[in-house]
Amino acid sequence: MQETALLERESAGTGNAPVRTDWTREEIAALFDLPFTELLFRAAEVHRAHHRAGEVQLCTLLSIKTGGCPEDCGYCSQSVKADSGVEATKLMEVQKVLQSAAQAKDNGSKRFCMGAAWRNPKDRDMPAIISMIKGVREMGMETCMTLGMLTPSQAAQLADAGLDYYNHNIDTSPERYEEVITTRTFADRLQTLDNVRNAGINVCSGGIVGMGETRADRVGFVHALATLEQHPESVPVNALVPIKGTVLGDMLADTPLAKIDDIEFVRTVAVARITMPLSMVRLSAGRESMSEATQALCFMAGANSIFTGDKLLTAANAGDDADAAMFKRLGLKPMEGEEPMRAMKSVGGCSGGCAA
């Protein structure tokens, strides 16, 4: 009876029902426990109620400053704690960044994301960052930055420059978090998300699965995002790319059974779609090792955004040509027009899951 009640309450979040931010862990766990085909059916219903079926947003991610990060994230090859062979670089010149953005636009990307391996940006770097944002926007592309933690003042500067999105992932569940990173707290991450939201910038926040976590951790990860006062406009779901020389990469090389299987990854995408119906759910790192069949299941489960191009920061990624061929085989097309949450904000009709 209790499971039935939970699933009946969960169904209130489907279709055109109000967006919920009061999900319980029990409800989310019940979704994960559904028969796989039933979960996909429910996720597809939610997706079609809020998004255009068959359209997938194309984004490009560029590392504008690689390596040398003082954080100890166990998955990251750019940490100074990792023995990954990644060499630290200086911040890219603005013109080179804009050249990369122009190429991404020519390849069909609508959003250009720029990432720097910093704990937080220094004030001396802000003028160059602002020039990058303005230059990319002048091309008619959406902009996203991921620079580490932000102060309210820095968030305001990025907002004034016209930044559309800021990415700051929560990585995993609050309980698992300290096993992955110790140099920045879970609360620190939430504070940066608050600073971004308060500055009027759209939030991009997700995490990584396949780090040896349990399903309970995946439940906690989705719960942490789905119960934010306002859902992230974008939710990237990464599958860990185990890199030699990183803590987690070396751990999983020795314990391959700790890796997440494809069906469980698709389940995570589906539960994210059901609990955050208006958000863009993005397939991010790890996609290059997924079969087209697995990716097709992810699209059926509600994923409607991908990173395209040959590289994501330091990890390999499916290239533009491979993605174009996959889109043709699956009958998908690049997304046009505004995302649902942004469109609702522009007409003043957003409630429950959108930013003010």
UniProtKB/Swiss-Prot annotation:
Enzyme superclass (EC): transferase
Radical SAM core domain boundaries: 54-278
Cofactor note: Binds 1 [4Fe-4S] cluster. The cluster is coordinated with 3 cysteines and an exchangeable S-adenosyl-L-methionine. Binds 1 [2Fe-2S] cluster. The cluster is coordinated with 3 cysteines and 1 arginine.
The entry's keywords: 2Fe-2S, 4Fe-4S, Biotin biosynthesis, Iron, Iron-sulfur, Metal-binding, S-adenosyl-L-methionine, Transferase
Entries under Gene3D superfamilies matching the protein: Aldolase class I
GO biological process annotation, one example: biotin biosynthetic process
Cofactor names: [4Fe-4S] cluster; [2Fe-2S] cluster
Recorded superkingdom: Bacteria
Binding sites annotated in the UniProt record for [4Fe-4S] cluster: 69, 73, 76
Pathway in which the depicted protein is active: Cofactor biosynthesis; biotin biosynthesis; biotin from 7,8-diaminononanoate: step 2/2
GO MF terms held by the record: 2 iron, 2 sulfur cluster binding; 4 iron, 4 sulfur cluster binding; biotin synthase activity; iron ion binding
PANTHER family documented for this protein: BIOTIN SYNTHASE, BIOTIN SYNTHASE, MITOCHONDRIAL
Family: Belongs to the radical SAM superfamily. Biotin synthase family.
Subunit structure: Homodimer.
The protein, known as: Biotin synthase
Origin species: Novosphingobium aromaticivorans (strain ATCC 700278 / DSM 12444 / CCUG 56034 / CIP 105152 / NBRC 16084 / F199)
Gene field: bioB
